[in-house]
Amino acid sequence: MANFIKPYNDDPFVGHLATPITSSSLTRALLKNLPAYRFGLTPLLRGLEIGLAHGYFLIGPFAQLGPLRNSDIGLLAGFLSTIGLILILTLGLTIYGAAAFGQEKSNGSELQTKKSWDQFKGGFFVGACGSAGFAFICLSSIPTFALN
């Protein structure tokens, strides 16, 4: 193992962030398939896909661990809490977009303009609300997925 980890360019005084984990081909392949780094996605589709993932996985903790988890409306409360958090996250994306891209600059980069960021934000909101709604419908109507 001592021969495997060595200083970058054999100079111990040069900092480098490459590790056996971060520089492996498996890690790079996994990261390249994430919607944030995938080549060829429009900002709207990028936001939609990220929103779909977030809305779908956020409803579970709210429904199972929320204060109304043992009541009849626990799932509905979890769904509404998820929508509330999605609104807060979208508001955060709006504030970031206004601060970072307030003056219109045309860098040519994919998410570095106000218009692209607004498309990303809209896709995120629609995707997250849609997937949270889909998860709510699945959890409330399919007996196999019912929360107990």
Curated annotation (Swiss-Prot):
One CC-aspect GO term: chloroplast thylakoid membrane
InterPro entries named in the record:
PSI_PsaL, PSI_PsaL_sf, PSI_suXI
Keyword Chloroplast in the entry? The reply is yes
**One Gene Ontology biological process:** photosynthesis
Q: Which domain of life is it from?
A: Eukaryota
Pfam families membership: PsaL
Residues passing through the membrane, by range: 48-68, 73-93, 122-142
Instruction: List locations, semicolon-separated.
Output: Plastid, Chloroplast thylakoid membrane
The membrane topology noted for this protein in its Swiss-Prot or TrEMBL record is:
Multi-pass membrane protein
Q: Which UniProt keywords apply?
A: Chloroplast, Membrane, Photosynthesis, Photosystem I, Plastid, Thylakoid, Transmembrane, Transmembrane helix
Q: What is its main location?
A: plastid
Indicate the family of this protein.
Belongs to the PsaL family.
Instruction: State the protein's name.
Output: Photosystem I reaction center subunit XI
Q: Which gene underlies this protein?
A: psaL
